[in-house]
Design a protein with these regions (language model features):
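An N-terminal, well-structured beta->alpha segment
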Residues: 1-62, 66-67, 145-175, 381, ...
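Gly/Ser/Thr-enriched, mixed-charge loops and adjacent short helices
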Residues: 13, 107-228
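Short glycine-rich phosphate-binding loop at a beta-alpha junction
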Residues: 40-48, 72, 174-176, 278-283, ...
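Proline/glycine-rich low-complexity loops and linkers
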Residues: 125-159, 164, 250-323, 330
């Protein structure tokens, strides 16, 4: 049973469950592992715009340097940039301080290996053990204490990497960017501007407490309304740490991760760059996505929910494209993790080179009506194993008869049960979703 790590690193309310003390212990635990392999290993640390990032960064740095690790801080930067820099400047580990799409009160610690990929389960468990035994970790002797460096200039390496992912520019396309008052604020507008796109921005004035506050990919209506009101060709909304993105077309229609994956897959297939014509998705992808994939001579494989599972499947089989409906899109030829800016640049380039609007490109996917209900529960494990709930799910699945589906899953980061139904009409999704959700609420909901 994990004590600290969830499906996407360590997360908690800053100052409560995620304290300076815990952050120091995480740094010391990671430092212990790294210094066992070499003297003065290097760790790069990035952050989003939350007010608590200072506290966590300084505590992590103290823990790392106390064991002899040299630390380079790069300031506010997207998560995929940390993953990219960790690999390309040959550091021994990378850390991103962020709680992604969560409100500013939360924060988190994501750790990457020297290859730019997130840690394995075994590595995380090893760190957990050391966190609880930091009193047994020796401090470095005075002459071997680690040093702290500033690496703010390294952001430019990531900027160049993204710009070089396409040939040509993005001139002639009017784009709106919603940076969620988060980690993409100082980078995304700069990249699109350099690529000669005509850009408008919102959510680019972080103040420490407004990250994801009515902006970003979890508040997609904000960018949708902006696009409609300002005669924009395409809008992109990033999440707080920039590892995912959702799009909207010129009419304000949402283009989610499923549609983005389909557009990218079709393009990559035409370019001969899609390994085995395969797209890796999760069980949350819409039935309409799978039908469009099949109709266009593409293949797909499903994983559990979570970008780490998508990446694992891609690495095991050397696949080049994968992602989630929520907007985590992994282009493995360019990145080791989901990258919202890279995805947005690639999608805009397809719009320009194809001569088609985003409406036309996304219109090939007919999305089935979908309803998702989140229920805060007392015990998500018991809810997932409850016989009455499971029987009701089987009953719904049978009634849908292959023309829809029901999915019951527990959140990996919160004490939530998610009930998702897809069917041929909104009436059916509402009916079946409520049918199951009612039982979950009656038996397990937090009152």
């Amino acid at each position: 049973m994990r004590k600290y790590f969830g499906t996407d690193g360590i997360r908690g309310i800053a100052g409560e469950s995620l304290t300076a003390d815990l952050s120091f212990k995480v740094g010391k635990a990671l430092g212990k592992l790294l210094t066992e392999k070499k003297e003065h290993p290097k760790v790069i640390i990035g952050r989003d715009t939350r007010i608590s990032c200072d506290m966590i960064e300084q505590a992590l740095t103290a823990g790392l340097t106390s064991t002899g690790v040299n630390v380079m801080t790069v300031g506010t930067i997207p998560t995929p940039a940390i993953a990219y820099l960790t690999k390309t400047i040959e550091t021994d580990s990378g850390i991103m301080i962020s709680a992604s799409h969560n409100p500013y009160q939360d924060n988190g610690i994501k750790i990457f290996g020297s290859d730019g990929f997130k840690l394995t389960d075994d590595q995380e468990l090893e760190i957990e053990y050391l966190i609880d035994n930091t009193d047994k970790i020796k401090n470095a002797s005075f002459e071997k204490i680690g040093k702290l460096y500033s690496g703010n200039e390294l952001t430019q390496k990531y900027v160049q990497h993204i710009k070089q992912s396409i040939s040509g520019d993005l001139s002639g396309i009017k784009i709106a960017l919603d940076c969620a008052n988060g980690a993409t604020t100082g980078v995304a507008p700069f990249i699109f501007g350099d690529l000669e796109a005509d850009i408008e921005t919102i959510g680019c004035k972080p103040n420490g407490i407004n990250i994801n506050d009515n902006v970003g990919s979890t508040k997609i209506d904000t960018i949708a309304n902006f696009v409609k009101e300002n005669n924009v060709d395409v809008g992109f909304a990033f999440d707080g740490d920039g590892d995912r993105v959702l799009a909207v077309d010129s009419k304000g229609n949402i283009v989610d991760g499923d549609k983005i994956m389909f557009i990218l897959a079709k393009h990559l297939k035409e370019q001969g760059e899609l390994k085995d014509n395969m797209v890796v998705s999760t069980v949350m992808s819409n039935i309409g996505f799978y039908k469009a994939i099949e109709e266009n001579g593409l293949q797909s494989v499903k994983t559990a929910v979570g970008d780490r599972y998508v990446v694992e499947e891609m690495r095991n089989n050397d696949y080049s494209l994968g992602g989630e409906q929520s907007g985590h899109i992994i282009l493995m030829n360019y990145a080791t993790t989901g990258d919202g800016i890279l995805t947005a640049v690639k999608l805009t380039n397809i719009i320009k080179t194809s001569g088609k609007s985003l409406e036309e490109l996304a219109g090939e996917v007919s999305i089935y009506p979908q309803k998702l209900v989140n229920i805060k529960v007392i015990d998500k494990k018991s809810a997932m194993e409850d016989a009455e709930i499971l029987v009701e799910c089987e009953k719904v699945e049978k009634e849908l008869e292959g023309n829809g589906r029901i999915l019951l899953r527990a959140s990996g980061t919160e004490n939530l049960i998610r009930v998702m139904v897809e069917a041929s009409s909104d009436e059916l999704t509402d009916k079946y979703c409520e049918q199951v959700a009612k039982i979950v609420r009656e038996k397990f909901e937090v009152k």
